[in-house]
UniProtKB/Swiss-Prot annotation:
Has 3 domains, the large (RuvB-L) and small ATPase (RuvB-S) domains and the C-terminal head (RuvB-H) domain. The head domain binds DNA, while the ATPase domains jointly bind ATP, ADP or are empty depending on the state of the subunit in the translocation cycle. During a single DNA translocation step the structure of each domain remains the same, but their relative positions change. Homohexamer. Forms an RuvA(8)-RuvB(12)-Holliday junction (HJ) complex. HJ DNA is sandwiched between 2 RuvA tetramers; dsDNA enters through RuvA and exits via RuvB. An RuvB hexamer assembles on each DNA strand where it exits the tetramer. Each RuvB hexamer is contacted by two RuvA subunits (via domain III) on 2 adjacent RuvB subunits; this complex drives branch migration. In the full resolvosome a probable DNA-RuvA(4)-RuvB(12)-RuvC(2) complex forms which resolves the HJ. This is Holliday junction branch migration complex subunit RuvB. Its main location: cytoplasm. It is an enzyme of class 3 (hydrolase). The lineage of its organism: Bacteria, Bacillati, Bacillota, Bacilli, Bacillales. NCBIfam families: PRK00080.1, ruvB. Keywords: ATP-binding, Cytoplasm, DNA damage, DNA recombination, DNA repair, DNA-binding, Hydrolase, Nucleotide-binding. Coiled coil: none annotated. It catalyses: ATP + H2O = ADP + phosphate + H(+). HAMAP family: DNA_HJ_migration_RuvB (MF_00016). Residues 1-182 are annotated as: Large ATPase domain (RuvB-L). One of its GO terms (cellular component) is Holliday junction resolvase complex. GO terms for molecular function: ATP binding; ATP hydrolysis activity; four-way junction DNA binding; four-way junction helicase activity.
Amino acid sequence: MEERLVSGDVHREDVSLEYSLRPKFLHEYIGQDKVKDNLKVFIEAAKMREETLDHVLLYGPPGLGKTTLAAIIANEMGVHLRTTSGPAIERPGDLAAILTSLEPGDVLFIDEIHRLHRSVEEVLYPAMEDYCLDIIIGKGQTARSIRIDLPPFTLVGATTRAGALSAPLRDRFGVISRLEYYTTEHLTQIVMRTAEILHVDITAEAAVEIARRSRGTPRIANRLLRRVRDFAQVRGDGTITFLLAKEALELLQVDRLGLDHIDHKLIKAIMEKFGGGPVGIDTIAATIGEEAQTIEDVYEPYLLQIGFLQRTPRGRIVTPIAYEHFGMEVPKQ
Protein backbone atom coordinates (compact mmCIF):
# COMPACT_ATOMS: atom_id res chain seq x y z
CA MET A 1 0.00 0.00 0.00
CA GLU A 2 1.42 3.37 -1.01
CA GLU A 3 2.13 6.14 1.52
CA ARG A 4 -0.62 8.74 1.13
CA LEU A 5 -0.24 12.45 1.73
CA VAL A 6 -3.70 12.53 3.34
CA SER A 7 -3.17 9.51 5.62
CA GLY A 8 -3.51 10.09 9.36
CA ASP A 9 -0.82 7.48 10.05
CA VAL A 10 2.74 8.54 10.88
CA HIS A 11 5.10 8.90 7.91
CA ARG A 12 8.87 8.62 8.31
CA GLU A 13 9.25 12.34 7.67
CA ASP A 14 6.70 13.16 10.39
CA VAL A 15 8.68 11.59 13.23
CA SER A 16 11.49 14.14 13.54
CA LEU A 17 9.24 17.19 13.19
CA GLU A 18 6.21 16.12 15.21
CA TYR A 19 8.07 16.24 18.52
CA SER A 20 9.10 19.88 17.99
CA LEU A 21 5.57 20.84 16.90
CA ARG A 22 3.74 19.24 19.83
CA PRO A 23 2.23 21.48 22.51
CA LYS A 24 3.61 20.70 25.96
CA PHE A 25 0.68 21.76 28.17
CA LEU A 26 -3.13 21.79 27.99
CA HIS A 27 -3.38 25.57 27.53
CA GLU A 28 -1.28 25.23 24.34
CA TYR A 29 -3.37 22.36 22.93
CA ILE A 30 -5.81 23.46 20.21
CA GLY A 31 -9.17 21.71 19.77
CA GLN A 32 -10.76 18.70 21.52
CA ASP A 33 -12.29 21.14 24.02
CA LYS A 34 -14.47 18.60 25.89
CA VAL A 35 -11.60 16.13 26.31
CA LYS A 36 -9.25 18.94 27.32
CA ASP A 37 -11.64 20.48 29.85
CA ASN A 38 -12.33 17.11 31.49
CA LEU A 39 -8.64 16.23 31.68
CA LYS A 40 -7.90 19.61 33.26
CA VAL A 41 -10.38 18.88 36.07
CA PHE A 42 -9.15 15.30 36.62
CA ILE A 43 -5.49 16.38 36.67
CA GLU A 44 -6.13 19.28 39.07
CA ALA A 45 -8.15 17.02 41.39
CA ALA A 46 -5.42 14.35 41.42
CA LYS A 47 -2.77 16.98 42.21
CA MET A 48 -4.89 18.47 45.02
CA ARG A 49 -5.25 14.99 46.57
CA GLU A 50 -1.56 14.25 45.89
CA GLU A 51 -2.60 11.08 44.06
CA THR A 52 -1.80 9.62 40.68
CA LEU A 53 -4.27 10.33 37.88
CA ASP A 54 -6.75 7.55 37.05
CA HIS A 55 -5.80 5.37 34.06
CA VAL A 56 -6.79 7.07 30.80
CA LEU A 57 -7.96 5.53 27.51
CA LEU A 58 -7.83 7.78 24.43
CA TYR A 59 -9.45 6.51 21.25
CA GLY A 60 -10.22 7.85 17.80
CA PRO A 61 -8.83 7.98 14.25
CA PRO A 62 -5.05 8.30 13.72
CA GLY A 63 -3.38 11.71 13.72
CA LEU A 64 -5.74 13.47 16.15
CA GLY A 65 -3.28 13.95 19.04
CA LYS A 66 -3.47 10.90 21.32
CA THR A 67 0.32 10.68 21.75
CA THR A 68 0.51 14.44 22.30
CA LEU A 69 -2.14 14.27 25.04
CA ALA A 70 -0.24 11.46 26.81
CA ALA A 71 2.87 13.66 26.94
CA ILE A 72 0.79 16.63 28.12
CA ILE A 73 -0.71 14.54 30.95
CA ALA A 74 2.81 13.68 32.16
CA ASN A 75 3.92 17.31 31.91
CA GLU A 76 0.85 18.61 33.73
CA MET A 77 1.36 16.03 36.50
CA GLY A 78 5.08 16.87 36.67
CA VAL A 79 6.20 13.25 36.15
CA HIS A 80 8.15 11.19 33.63
CA LEU A 81 6.59 9.66 30.50
CA ARG A 82 7.45 6.13 29.40
CA THR A 83 6.33 5.25 25.88
CA THR A 84 5.80 1.87 24.24
CA SER A 85 3.25 0.15 21.98
CA GLY A 86 1.10 -2.97 21.99
CA PRO A 87 3.09 -4.77 19.26
CA ALA A 88 6.40 -4.00 21.04
CA ILE A 89 5.35 -5.88 24.19
CA GLU A 90 5.58 -9.45 22.96
CA ARG A 91 5.72 -11.36 26.27
CA PRO A 92 4.52 -10.84 29.85
CA GLY A 93 8.17 -10.51 30.87
CA ASP A 94 8.56 -7.48 28.58
CA LEU A 95 5.71 -5.71 30.36
CA ALA A 96 7.00 -6.74 33.79
CA ALA A 97 10.39 -5.19 32.97
CA ILE A 98 8.73 -1.89 32.00
CA LEU A 99 6.42 -1.79 35.03
CA THR A 100 9.16 -2.53 37.57
CA SER A 101 11.30 0.28 36.16
CA LEU A 102 8.62 2.95 36.72
CA GLU A 103 9.03 5.63 39.37
CA PRO A 104 6.14 6.75 41.61
CA GLY A 105 3.56 8.76 39.64
CA ASP A 106 5.04 8.01 36.21
CA VAL A 107 2.83 7.93 33.11
CA LEU A 108 3.13 4.79 30.99
CA PHE A 109 1.83 5.36 27.46
CA ILE A 110 0.91 2.27 25.42
CA ASP A 111 0.03 3.11 21.83
CA GLU A 112 -2.07 0.62 19.82
CA ILE A 113 -3.08 -0.95 23.13
CA HIS A 114 -5.71 -3.06 21.32
CA ARG A 115 -2.81 -5.10 19.88
CA LEU A 116 -1.58 -6.38 23.25
CA HIS A 117 -1.39 -10.16 23.46
CA ARG A 118 -3.97 -11.63 25.83
CA SER A 119 -1.28 -13.12 28.11
CA VAL A 120 0.28 -9.65 28.43
CA GLU A 121 -3.14 -8.12 29.17
CA GLU A 122 -3.62 -10.49 32.09
CA VAL A 123 -0.40 -9.24 33.68
CA LEU A 124 -1.70 -5.69 33.28
CA TYR A 125 -4.94 -6.26 35.22
CA PRO A 126 -3.48 -6.46 38.78
CA ALA A 127 -0.92 -3.79 37.86
CA MET A 128 -3.70 -1.34 36.96
CA GLU A 129 -6.02 -2.25 39.85
CA ASP A 130 -3.69 -2.96 42.77
CA TYR A 131 -0.26 -1.72 41.59
CA CYS A 132 1.24 -5.17 41.84
CA LEU A 133 2.57 -7.97 39.65
CA ASP A 134 1.75 -11.64 40.13
CA ILE A 135 4.63 -13.67 38.70
CA ILE A 136 4.80 -17.46 38.40
CA ILE A 137 8.21 -18.91 39.25
CA GLY A 138 9.09 -22.48 38.29
CA LYS A 139 7.08 -25.07 36.38
CA GLY A 140 4.72 -27.92 37.12
CA GLN A 141 4.33 -28.96 40.76
CA THR A 142 7.17 -26.71 41.91
CA ALA A 143 5.59 -23.58 40.41
CA ARG A 144 4.70 -20.84 42.86
CA SER A 145 3.32 -17.36 42.58
CA ILE A 146 5.03 -14.31 44.05
CA ARG A 147 3.62 -10.81 44.26
CA ILE A 148 5.77 -7.76 43.48
CA ASP A 149 4.54 -4.35 44.58
CA LEU A 150 4.70 -1.56 42.00
CA PRO A 151 4.81 2.19 42.52
CA PRO A 152 1.54 4.01 41.78
CA PHE A 153 1.44 4.97 38.09
CA THR A 154 -0.97 6.17 35.41
CA LEU A 155 -1.50 4.07 32.30
CA VAL A 156 -2.52 6.04 29.22
CA GLY A 157 -3.69 3.72 26.46
CA ALA A 158 -4.32 4.86 22.89
CA THR A 159 -6.22 3.02 20.19
CA THR A 160 -7.86 3.61 16.84
CA ARG A 161 -10.11 0.60 17.50
CA ALA A 162 -11.80 0.87 20.89
CA GLY A 163 -14.13 -1.98 19.97
CA ALA A 164 -11.15 -4.33 19.67
CA LEU A 165 -10.28 -3.89 23.37
CA SER A 166 -11.36 -6.68 25.68
CA ALA A 167 -14.04 -5.71 28.20
CA PRO A 168 -11.85 -6.50 31.26
CA LEU A 169 -9.13 -4.15 30.01
CA ARG A 170 -11.51 -1.39 28.98
CA ASP A 171 -13.30 -1.52 32.35
CA ARG A 172 -10.06 -0.81 34.23
CA PHE A 173 -9.71 2.68 32.74
CA GLY A 174 -11.17 5.41 34.96
CA VAL A 175 -11.14 8.03 32.19
CA ILE A 176 -12.27 7.13 28.65
CA SER A 177 -12.17 9.90 26.03
CA ARG A 178 -12.95 9.88 22.33
CA LEU A 179 -11.03 12.29 20.11
CA GLU A 180 -13.14 13.76 17.31
CA TYR A 181 -12.13 15.13 13.91
CA TYR A 182 -11.12 18.80 14.14
CA THR A 183 -13.09 21.75 12.82
CA THR A 184 -11.64 23.88 10.02
CA GLU A 185 -11.35 26.74 12.53
CA HIS A 186 -9.18 24.71 14.92
CA LEU A 187 -7.09 23.29 12.07
CA THR A 188 -6.50 26.83 10.79
CA GLN A 189 -5.14 27.78 14.22
CA ILE A 190 -2.88 24.70 14.15
CA VAL A 191 -1.57 25.57 10.67
CA MET A 192 -0.82 29.14 11.78
CA ARG A 193 0.94 27.89 14.93
CA THR A 194 3.03 25.36 12.98
CA ALA A 195 3.95 27.98 10.38
CA GLU A 196 5.21 30.25 13.16
CA ILE A 197 7.33 27.46 14.67
CA LEU A 198 8.78 26.59 11.23
CA HIS A 199 9.34 30.30 10.41
CA VAL A 200 7.03 30.15 7.39
CA ASP A 201 5.15 33.25 6.22
CA ILE A 202 1.53 32.39 5.49
CA THR A 203 -1.65 34.40 4.96
CA ALA A 204 -4.81 33.68 6.95
CA GLU A 205 -6.66 32.70 3.74
CA ALA A 206 -3.93 30.21 2.82
CA ALA A 207 -4.08 28.65 6.29
CA VAL A 208 -7.85 28.17 5.91
CA GLU A 209 -7.36 26.55 2.49
CA ILE A 210 -4.83 24.05 3.88
CA ALA A 211 -7.07 23.37 6.90
CA ARG A 212 -10.12 22.70 4.67
CA ARG A 213 -8.24 19.98 2.82
CA SER A 214 -6.77 18.29 5.90
CA ARG A 215 -9.60 15.80 6.59
CA GLY A 216 -10.11 17.09 10.13
CA THR A 217 -6.65 15.80 11.12
CA PRO A 218 -3.78 17.92 12.53
CA ARG A 219 -1.09 15.50 11.34
CA ILE A 220 -2.34 15.87 7.75
CA ALA A 221 -2.59 19.66 8.12
CA ASN A 222 1.04 19.90 9.24
CA ARG A 223 2.16 17.58 6.44
CA LEU A 224 0.31 19.58 3.77
CA LEU A 225 1.77 22.80 5.16
CA ARG A 226 5.30 21.43 4.76
CA ARG A 227 4.62 20.37 1.16
CA VAL A 228 3.03 23.72 0.27
CA ARG A 229 6.03 25.46 1.87
CA ASP A 230 8.23 23.71 -0.72
CA PHE A 231 6.14 25.22 -3.54
CA ALA A 232 6.30 28.67 -1.91
CA GLN A 233 10.09 28.52 -1.76
CA VAL A 234 10.61 27.16 -5.29
CA ARG A 235 7.75 28.80 -7.23
CA GLY A 236 7.07 31.89 -5.13
CA ASP A 237 8.82 34.33 -2.83
CA GLY A 238 8.60 32.10 0.25
CA THR A 239 5.22 33.37 1.43
CA ILE A 240 2.27 30.97 1.27
CA THR A 241 -0.66 32.85 -0.27
CA PHE A 242 -4.17 31.55 -0.94
CA LEU A 243 -3.54 31.15 -4.68
CA LEU A 244 -0.20 29.42 -4.15
CA ALA A 245 -1.70 27.02 -1.56
CA LYS A 246 -4.64 26.22 -3.87
CA GLU A 247 -2.36 25.58 -6.86
CA ALA A 248 0.09 23.48 -4.83
CA LEU A 249 -2.62 21.30 -3.31
CA GLU A 250 -4.20 20.72 -6.71
CA LEU A 251 -0.80 19.66 -8.09
CA LEU A 252 -0.49 17.33 -5.08
CA GLN A 253 -3.90 15.87 -6.07
CA VAL A 254 -5.60 16.86 -2.83
CA ASP A 255 -9.03 18.30 -3.66
CA ARG A 256 -11.10 20.85 -1.72
CA LEU A 257 -12.48 18.17 0.64
CA GLY A 258 -9.10 16.50 1.19
CA LEU A 259 -9.80 13.60 -1.17
CA ASP A 260 -6.79 12.23 -3.04
CA HIS A 261 -6.44 10.19 -6.25
CA ILE A 262 -7.18 6.91 -4.44
CA ASP A 263 -10.44 8.27 -3.02
CA HIS A 264 -11.35 9.49 -6.51
CA LYS A 265 -10.53 6.11 -8.02
CA LEU A 266 -12.66 4.25 -5.48
CA ILE A 267 -15.71 6.52 -5.74
CA LYS A 268 -15.56 6.78 -9.54
CA ALA A 269 -15.23 2.99 -9.89
CA ILE A 270 -18.52 2.53 -8.04
CA MET A 271 -20.18 5.33 -10.03
CA GLU A 272 -18.98 4.43 -13.50
CA LYS A 273 -18.79 0.64 -13.37
CA PHE A 274 -21.60 -0.24 -10.96
CA GLY A 275 -24.09 2.60 -11.42
CA GLY A 276 -23.39 3.99 -7.96
CA GLY A 277 -24.01 0.65 -6.22
CA PRO A 278 -24.89 -1.28 -4.25
CA VAL A 279 -21.72 -3.28 -4.85
CA GLY A 280 -19.83 -5.70 -2.60
CA ILE A 281 -16.51 -4.80 -1.00
CA ASP A 282 -14.69 -7.73 -2.63
CA THR A 283 -15.86 -6.60 -6.06
CA ILE A 284 -14.64 -3.05 -5.38
CA ALA A 285 -11.30 -4.41 -4.19
CA ALA A 286 -10.82 -6.46 -7.35
CA THR A 287 -11.82 -3.48 -9.52
CA ILE A 288 -9.33 -0.98 -8.06
CA GLY A 289 -6.58 -3.47 -7.21
CA GLU A 290 -6.64 -3.07 -3.43
CA GLU A 291 -7.30 -5.51 -0.58
CA ALA A 292 -10.82 -5.47 0.86
CA GLN A 293 -9.44 -5.04 4.40
CA THR A 294 -7.38 -2.02 3.31
CA ILE A 295 -10.45 -0.40 1.77
CA GLU A 296 -12.49 -0.96 4.95
CA ASP A 297 -9.78 0.17 7.40
CA VAL A 298 -7.98 2.92 5.45
CA TYR A 299 -10.03 4.38 2.61
CA GLU A 300 -13.68 4.06 3.66
CA PRO A 301 -13.78 5.74 7.11
CA TYR A 302 -13.34 9.29 5.82
CA LEU A 303 -15.68 8.73 2.86
CA LEU A 304 -18.32 7.47 5.31
CA GLN A 305 -17.60 10.39 7.66
CA ILE A 306 -18.27 13.02 4.96
CA GLY A 307 -21.32 11.13 3.67
CA PHE A 308 -19.97 10.11 0.25
CA LEU A 309 -20.48 6.38 0.88
CA GLN A 310 -23.11 4.29 2.61
CA ARG A 311 -22.72 0.73 3.85
CA THR A 312 -25.86 -1.36 3.31
CA PRO A 313 -26.58 -5.10 3.64
CA ARG A 314 -26.40 -5.31 -0.18
CA GLY A 315 -23.09 -3.45 -0.47
CA ARG A 316 -21.63 0.05 -0.83
CA ILE A 317 -23.66 2.90 -2.33
CA VAL A 318 -22.37 6.29 -3.52
CA THR A 319 -24.55 9.14 -2.20
CA PRO A 320 -26.00 12.09 -4.17
CA ILE A 321 -23.59 14.56 -2.52
CA ALA A 322 -20.66 12.56 -3.91
CA TYR A 323 -22.14 12.86 -7.42
CA GLU A 324 -22.51 16.60 -6.85
CA HIS A 325 -18.87 16.89 -5.73
CA PHE A 326 -17.67 15.15 -8.90
CA GLY A 327 -20.03 17.14 -11.14
CA MET A 328 -21.99 14.06 -12.22
CA GLU A 329 -25.72 13.38 -12.38
CA VAL A 330 -27.26 10.89 -9.98
CA PRO A 331 -28.45 7.87 -12.03
CA LYS A 332 -32.21 7.32 -12.10
CA GLN A 333 -33.28 4.16 -10.34
